[in-house]
Structures are given as C-alpha cells and as structure tokens.
C-alpha cells in the first residue's frame, strides 16, 4: 500500500515537472481585431437571411472569391440584411431587439458597422415599426448622396422612417398607405411601388423633411401581370420581372416615373413547356454590359418563387436571350458582381448525400422526407461564360435567402 502511494506521488511529481516545462514555453494567444482589406474589386460577397429557425439572431456572412468565410454580423431579430455604402467604409443594418430576447419591450435601431473591422460604430434609434419580410430588397435604401437612409415600416399601416446618417438622428415618419419597396431616384427623390400599379413619389429637402409627395397613375395592371418588387437599377432605369414572365424597364428620376419597354422572357413554346421565373431573389443585373440575369425553372406558374435550376441571360438593349446557364444545384437567389470578369453567385438548397440515396428518400417520403436533410450551399460561376468555378458547401445552418456582391 505504501509503495503504491509512493508510485502515485512520483507519477504526479513527474507530470507536474513536465507540465511546468511545457508551460514555460507556452505563449498565450492575444485577442485582437482583424482588419479586412479593401473589398473593392475582390469579388467578395455577403449572404443573409432570417436564420430560421433561430430568427431572434439574424445573420449576415461575408465570403471571399475562394469561398473563405471572412466574418459575420449578428443583425437582430429576422434580419433585413445590409445596406452597403459606396462612399464610406460603413455598413448599415436596420435591427430589431426585445428586452427579454423573444419578448418584452421592442427597440428598433439603425446599426452602423465599420466595413474594415465589422465592429459596431454607433446606433440610431428609429420607431419600432420596421417591416420584416422574406423579400428584403427595397426595405432599407440610401439616397444617392448617402446622406439619408429610408426604412420601410409595416404595422400593418405602411410608412417610411427617414434617418439622417450625417447627423445620426431620426428625422420623421411619412405615411405611404398601400405602397411598399422603396427605390432611390436621385439625391432626394424616392419611389415606392403601390398596390394599384402606380408609384408613390417622395421628395426630401436638405434636412430630410418631406418637400413634396404625390401618387402617379398606374403603370401596370397588378391583376393581369404582377411585378415582383426585387428591382435592379442602372442609372435612372429600374428593371423588374413579372409573375407572367415579362421584363419591365421603368425610368425613375426627379421628373417622374415612366414605362420605357417590356418584353417576354420566354417563347410560346417555352411557356407551354412550363418554363418561368423562380426564386426569392431571382434577378441580377450587370450594369456595364447591360445583361439581365434571371433565375428560371420548369414548374406551374403559381410556383414562381420556388427554387430555380437555370439562369437565363438577356441583353436589355436587344431584349434577346444571350445564354442559358445550367446550375449545379437548385437555387433560391442569385447575384452578379460588377466590373470586369464578373462572377455569378448562386445561393442553393442541396442534400449533402449521394444522389441515389436522395432519390430513394424522395420516392419513399416525398418533399417531407427530404426537408430535414436540406442544407444550403453557394456555387460560383463565371458570369461571362457560365463556367462553374467552385462550390461552398459548408455554410452555417439557418435560412439564408439573399446573396449580394460587395
């Protein structure tokens, strides 16, 4: 018994000496803040969404062109994503918080983040009315000179909160009954699309107060052909696609809004074969080349927001299709970087298992059997040639529904 205790004591002593020697050479890692390079020209991109089923912790993730995760932002309950400044190294997020996590007093803020460190710089309180929606484009927009941020509200009464980013203060709230999705059209002019097919034109003065407001005559019939609100801008032109697979070009500026042109995205034969628009954020525009990218699939017309399998590319001048890009996975959202050598980004749903096993699960359990296995991934393509470049299959769990080039 005594010898056994002595052996234990010697063993403990040797471990203490060994660990002491190891600790003597140990240099603790110092916590710090990484600083990102300039994002311009890097083909970096963000993805964001509600982070379902954990909607109280909305997320936005930053990736580089090689698929490396560079950072993330936690953007409050049911993220509406980010608004990216082109003039300042700043990012803006309209965020919702509750004093007890999922209950209690609600507070809405515009959070301003440093684009190099992703650290919060300051908050601007706004009315606790910010709209939350699956389609997040047009819910928060910058004026062209980036002085003001406009935030869409829904209580269910519709209104706009005006925020002065220079003075870091809430200016005022403007009712816009029956209208939604905001589109900037100059330093002080904005439009919101309305349920009757017209637009609400809002003009601000230099302090951010309302200088004038008016409703336009209807430009389209929403009962015959409903425009999707995910518009894309090129100068003073905005491009939309409709539920019946048409493209619309609208000119918006300080003088007013006017329909410029419209054309069909599909031929009669393609329409009869079931081809149509797809996805939650299924359109993108490369401004320099004038190319419109539209996510498409074969399905029933009423399923126009289900995932897509191809991206069709159109010349907005000739209104002709230039290419069809077959996707590796089913996509819910696309984005296209600007400048030379653009990238096409596809935010996809996938089952990370062999295809035969996936087919067996679908045949035996249908959509309900596949749903628990679904994960999200990203695929990158050369937007000029359609060549697949790489896949990013290991993105965090949670429903992401926007991919946005930075």
Description of each model-found segment:
Residues 23-406:
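Predominantly soluble domains enriched in secretory-pathway, periplasmic, or organellar proteins
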